[in-house]
Design a protein with these regions (language model features):
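Short helix-loop capping/hinge motifs at secondary-structure junctions, enriched
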Residues: 45-47
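Non-catalytic surface loops within mature trypsin-like serine protease
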Residues: 42-43, 67
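The catalytic Nudix box helix
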Residues: 1-21, 39, 55, 64
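Nudix hydrolase/Nudix homology domain
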Residues: 21, 29-32, 37, 55-99
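Polybasic "coupling" helices that flank or enter modular domains
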Residues: 15, 23-41, 50
């Protein structure tokens, strides 16, 4: 969880009051043994600039959770490559928020 908090700030410029574990699994089944853990972050506060390391290009886009699926579909239609895992993780986040 400490690594997730650190990465959230470094990559997005936001910190979270609460991190709720969602799921963990291999980054790429059969191709890698790297395991990723995902969290739902709530109680967000902007604490600095986003961007990650010097060799990373990160753009933070704020989209209400109710609009994320449509946003991703439109991004794909516009030629953006969206990792398919993102669609599943958005649904897990929606379900967790509904509980």
């Amino acid at each position: 969880e400490a690594a997730a908090r650190r990465e959230l700030i470094e990559e997005t410029g936001w910190s979270a009051r609460e991190l709720r574990f969602l799921v963990e699994g291999p980054m790429s089944t059969g191709a890698s043994t790297e395991i990723i853990r995902t969290y739902l972050c709530t109680g967000l506060e902007h604490v600095g600039k986003s961007g990650g390391d010097d060799n990373e290009i990160i753009e933070v886009i704020e989209v209400p959770i109710r609009d994320v699926h449509e946003y991703l579909v439109n991004a794909q239609a516009g030629g953006v490559l969206v990792d398919l895992k993102v669609f599943g993780l958005v649904e897990l986040a929606r379900r967790a928020l509904a509980r």
